[in-house]
Amino acid sequence: MACAGLLTVCLIRPPAPEPPRPPAPAPAAGPAGHALFQDVFRRADKNDDGKLSFEEFQNYFADGVLSPGELRELFSGVDGHPADNLETEKLCDYFSEHLGVYRPVLAALESLNCAVLTAMDTTKLEYERASKVDQFVTRFLLRETVSQLQALQSSLEGASDTLEAQAQGPRSDEERVEVPSRPRGSRWAGRRALRSVSRSSTWSPGSSNTGQSSEAEMQWRLQINRLQELIDQLECKAPRLEPLHEEELTKGPSSHILVAQRQVQVAEEALQDFHHALCCYVDFTGSQSHCLHVSAQKMLDKASFTLYEFWQDEASWRRHQQSACSKAFQRILIDHLRAPDTLTTVFFPASWWIMNNN
């Protein structure tokens, strides 16, 4: 009986668990940088047909170094034979084969992009209901992440600018290669100028510096980054004229603003005195409550200036003309000009004047 019971227990005992199977191999990811290249060349593909014409290829890759003939040779070499169009996938494969030391860099960029997006999504969901301490930590981590990325970007931009300058070098007019124009805003121009300044912390091909910057250099880069942010803020507050579509204007004293343009030609021997008087006048005029904006431009080829004044209305401008500062400036004009000044006024709808205070 005991044997029968033991046999019954053995028969109903659950089978021993199977040893865990090794995880199935993850699908092979594309080569490093492949996804990044796909996104880049998708932007170059203006008609979104998966191919680049030579015109699209030239517009995107022209850098002022390779001539149109050299670009055409590269265009044909990627595909292996002359063709009118080049598939973006073949272009991705071509660059993937030439990554060299940048292969881990691009792989890290792809991983970084995913990590940043994940962190941003989590922050968006959890920040509002987090404690004040956790919110402080999140802001600190985000700020430091931005600083580190900006420092890396500054180093890369310095290296890129140095290589471009060396590749272009001094060229004669016959050798100069034109780059197709691309729209670039004032913000890009401001940052480009700052990049030229930051290059003084120097990067050059063959340098043994592997990124171990001194404390002074790091502080210098941080100051440049802060200056970039300040430029962005100032540019956002710059006044601009912007018409409203199909706007119905109402007549009244405040329906239009006045723009006064004054062109002057200064005698060479009086430039210093005139410039001092002009600066005083601009400072005084800009401080007036009814003056929207005032600026002066100097022509480089001659001692000529153009002064622009934007006023809320004509009455405000005429009252300003009678002020002691304005009359003193007019006397300066009489004493220091080579020829009589030219004054032009024009009216704009007041609703066109938009001040962006964000």
From Swiss-Prot:
Modifications the protein undergoes after translation, according to the UniProt entry: Phosphorylated by NEK2.
Compartments (UniProt record): Golgi apparatus
Region described as Required for interaction with APBA3: 177-186
Biased amino acid composition, Basic and acidic residues: 171-181
Alphabetical keyword list: Calcium, Golgi apparatus, Metal-binding, Phosphoprotein
Keyword Metal-binding: yes
Top-level division of the source organism's lineage: Eukaryota
GO MF, one example: calcium ion binding
Entry function: Inhibits the interaction of APBA2 with amyloid-beta precursor protein (APP), and hence allows formation of amyloid-beta. May enhance the activity of HIF1A and thus promote glycolysis under normoxic conditions; the function requires its ABM domain and may implicate the stabilization of the interaction between HIF1AN and APBA3.
Subunit structure: Interacts with the N-terminal domain of APBA2. Interacts with NEK2. Interacts with APBA3; APBA3 seems to mediate the interaction between NECAB3 and HIF1AN.
Protein's UniProt name: N-terminal EF-hand calcium-binding protein 3
Organism: Bos taurus (Bovine)
